[in-house]
Every structure is written in C-alpha cells, then in structure tokens.
Amino acid sequence: RAMELGCDVISEKPMTVDEAKCQEILDAIARTGRKLRVTFNYRYSPHATRIRELLRDGAIGTVHQVHFEWVLDTIHGADYFRRWHRDKRNSGGLLVHKATHHFDLVNFWIASRPKTVFAFGDLVFYGRENAERRGVTRFYSRVHGSPQAAGDPFALHLAQNAALKALYLDAEKDDGYLRDQSVFGDGISIEDTM
C-alpha cells in the first residue's frame, strides 16, 4: 500500500512470511518503481557497530576471508524450541530465522557480499525423539499447568515471573501465542546444531 501511495519502504526482516506475499511485494516494486529496503536491527547494536568501525579503520588490515561461528547456548537457544520457531514451516529454521542476522553482520562489517556461503544442520538435542534416546521419560506439552514440568531445567515458568506473566501468559487468551512449550515435545523440526 505504501508504494501505491508513492512511498519507498523500509521493512524489518522478514518482509513477509510466504512466497505469495513476497511476489505481491516484488510486483508492487515493478509496478510503482518504488524502492524496498529490508533491514536487520542487530547490526546497530553498539558492539556490532564498533566492530565495523575497527575494520573500516584498518585495525586488522584487509579482510580476505571470514570464518564466522555463533555458539548459541541452551539458555538463550532453548527459547527457539519453546515457541513458534520450533516448526520449520513457520520459521524456515534457525539458518533462516537466526543466521540471516549473522550473514548480515559479516556483510555490514566488511562492506562486502560473499561469493560462497556454506551451512549445514541437524536436530540432535531438542525434540522428543532425542530426549527419549537420552533416557528422558517425563514429557509434557507446555509448562503452564503441567506438574511434569517441575524440575525440568529447560522449563520456562511464566507464572513465576510477574513481567513474563503480564507480557505473555496473560496475553495468551488474546493472541494464542504459547511461549512455554516443552523443548523436548513433539513437533520440533528445526535444526539445533549448525
């Protein structure tokens, strides 16, 4: 709509969530001649911006190659397996949902685009099947209202934190968004090892 009104558009990623809507946006660009910029907010964090400044100022010389690894621990990483991201049909997986920020950071830091990118992944820790292989026998769908969640170090107890309760648990009746699903439940199809 903004392009039809003569405006260029700046969008946070993702610009849309499916192929048909993406095609509508591309058609609007072709039809109106307007511009679209999809941005990544993470590049503007203070440490990311400082890295760019250091590289631009030649602090380590000319960069010829980048090997970039991001280790996502089970404290922050588990969150992706509690929420909507856990189903690859919703998120495209962490290589799409999370790693796009990492690719953008490298492009931002060295003011260049890659000639080759390689990535791979597998699901080896989270999900019911992997938990069963490790001997887990207590399963539950979500933490709230589940006695089986007691003692699970990965359980997110929304009701025990006033801020989380107000932000998320109390809003479920309106948005249906569950943030406390079991990371060892069924329906997890994204990779946890990349």
Labelled PLM ranges:
Residues R34, Y42-Q181:
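Predominantly a Rossmann-like dinucleotide-binding segment in NAD(P)-dependent oxidoreductases
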Residues I29, D57, F108, D186-G187:
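Sterically constrained small-residue positions within well-ordered secondary structures
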Residues Y177, V183-M194:
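Glycine-enriched catalytic-core subsegment of oxygenase/oxidase enzymes
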Residues R1-R43, G58:
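Beta-strand-loop-alpha-helix segment that lines the small-molecule cofactor/substrate pocket
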Residues A20, G58, H97-K98, I188-E191:
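A generic fold-level signal
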Residues D8, H102-D104, D192:
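Acidic side chains
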